[in-house]
Each structure stands twice: as C-alpha cells, then as structure tokens.
C-alpha cells in the first residue's frame, strides 16, 4: 500500500484540528455552511458532466437531469435545510416548530420535516415527509433532544470519524460529511469510493475551507486503504455506505478466521461503526379501483424507483408486491413492462452488475429481458417462499421481481404484505406502500 505516511499525517492533522471545530461559534459554523451552495453552483456543470461521462450517459440524453437532481439539487437542499435549523437555534428558538411534533393514535411521536419552507411547497407541491420517532420516546423528549449538540451545556469532545464513501451516488458521501461535521460534531476523513472518486476534486473545492482548517480530509485508494484507516488508532468511529460484504470485511476481517469471529461475535474492529448496507426493497401496491391513467402513472412511479441511476441504488425497488386477488394486477404489470421497455437505454456502470443480473435471473421461470438487451429484466410470479435470489440478495441493478400474495380484503393483504416484507425480504432500509385515497379512507384502521 502506498502513501502510508500521508494517511497517517492526514489523521494526525484531523486529530489536532478537532478542538478548533468544537470551539468554533455557531454563527461561524453557519457562515461556513452558507458558503457551500455558491461553491456547488460554481462546479455543478463540470461535476454533472464528469458523472454522466463516467456512467456512460450520452451528452444528449434525458438521463442527464438525474445528475442535476440527485447529486446537485439534493446537496444544496440539504445544506439549506441545515442552515434553516441552525439559524433557528442561533435566534433562541426551538429547532423545529412545536406544532411539527405530534403524537399519533398509537402513541408514537411523528415529526413533520418537509416541506420546511415556501420554496419546498412550491417546488414539490403535495409532497410531505415525516420522521417517526422510536416508540417510547415522548414528544417532549423529542423536542428537547433536537439539535442537542447546539443546545447542551456540556458538549462532548469531537471524534475523528472515517467515512467510507458510497460509490453509486456522490451526494451520499457529501451529506455524510455534513452529518458528521454538523449533526454529530466530528471531524472526518473521507475515503472516496474508487467507483466515483472522480468527484473528489470537486468536493475538495466545495469543502476547501473545512480542509484548510484541518476539519476534513479526502483520501483515495482501494480496500487496502480503507482497511488501514478503519483500524488506525487515530480513528474513533466509522460510517460506511456499501455492501454487506464490505461491512463484514471491515468488522470481521477477510482471513480464514473471519467466519469464526462472526459466529462467536468477536469483531476484529474494536470501535463503533454505523452502516447503510442496502437490501431488498419492496413496492407494495394496495388493491383498489384504479383507472387506466392511475395504472400508467403508478407504473411510471414503479419503473422510476427501479431504473434511476441504472438501478444502482441501495433503496431501489427490487420486489413488486401485489394481491393475487386484485383484478387489475395483470394490467399494472403490463404497464410496468411497457414503461421499462420504452425507457431510454443506459448501461449499468457499477462493477459486477452483469454478474448480479445473471445471478438474479438464473433458473427463474417467467424472466423477461426488456429494452432489447440484458440490462433490464422483469421476473413475474416469483414464489414468495422459494428463497429465490431476487428475494434474498440485493441486485443493485435493473432487475424487478413480482410477488403475488393472498388477500381478499385490504386488511388481509396488508397483513400478508407486511409479514412478507419483514420476514422474507432481506434488510430493512426502505419500502413503498401505494394506496389510492378512496381505499385508504375506507380502510383507515388497516
């Protein structure tokens, strides 16, 4: 492995700079955040162009809009939201409005987090987002703990966090940086993923002030560099976005004793680690009385959750869950098939994608390759209890399975769908439930 002294020096500089970050007044931290969006805008065209070239997207393709949305707009949006909250704290207000924190009928606390501004309402009219707080935490505790880092009298000492960056979406790594600096109060070393390390120079420009003041370092290399940094004594904590295999390699090791360590819960890593590892995400369609326009619109919705970023998303839809008793199920599948078939082609760019597509489709009856190549596939009528790869292994590419579950009523179907998602599908990162307003109103207790 090259550049071990440089890696050691980077971590030493972060360790030395950490107290300065902790002592920086909130007003100054906000000012540093406010300087980021103009820097993002400054490099946005070149950053988007670099990403589209790396992903094999033609300069005339409509897919280019994706980069501007998920890798640039989301970046700026997250920063502006953070600024909004911190300015409220600076002014002596609670981080969120009191009426945004409320308790549901079952006693669980819910926080309304989007829209937060008039701009949000204008841009994404009709959309809303909530955070559901862990059961047992009261509304009063939720309000008291919000932005606790900036409202406590005795803040904890900052740690050096190693961020092992995501290779699929650059904005994940960028927001991990914001999370560590501003939400957790840590300084951080970011090991860029080799798949998208071309974004590193842009981030070095955007975060240049944080780097120059010793609060952030961007580092490059493969698994050997990541392993060295993870076990370095000057790294206190780790956050990883990647595969379960990468997590296992970091925590349990890769030698012939790794399986034994895992079986006996003797991790090789002796420090806290958090991770987002993806999984098999369901798209559950609650049966209802849908029009032809409804079917087409929701088919486009389903296809989008599968095809965005060529399917290289940790929370991409992998299994479409339908009621076997719904008369419109076949029509919805036909619409999904048509949308995916007619979508503009784009190559899978993530390493190993072709092998994962092959593995997911191998031996599966009803596999249809769509769009004229083998990069997109629909597997209809997957047996929910077959243990098929599409149900247990994250594909991270353009394969969509369809499972039909019994349920003559909405309540019966939802019970079966939730049980299937929780007990059969691997992981718990995300799920989508789509239900038409009339059916939802009629089955509010379901």
Language-model segments: residues:
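N-terminal Rossmann-like NAD(P)+-binding subdomain of aldehyde/semialdehyde dehydrogenases
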Residues: 1-145, 180, 192-194, 206, ...
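Conserved C-terminal structural/oligomerization subdomain of aldehyde/semialdehyde dehydrogenase
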Residues: 2, 17-35, 154-155, 162, ...
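Conserved short loop/turn motifs at secondary-structure junctions
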Residues: 33, 66-67, 192-196, 318-324, ...
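Active-site-adjacent "gating/activation" loops or surface patches in catalytic cores
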Residues: 125-175, 184
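PLP-dependent aminotransferase-like
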Residues: 160, 172-224
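C-terminal substrate/ligand-recognition segments
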Residues: 163-179, 192, 403, 411, ...
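Generic beta-strand/beta-sheet core signal
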Residues: 164, 189-193, 219-221, 232, ...
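ALDH superfamily catalytic-core signature
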Residues: 204-211, 215, 225-227, 231-233, ...
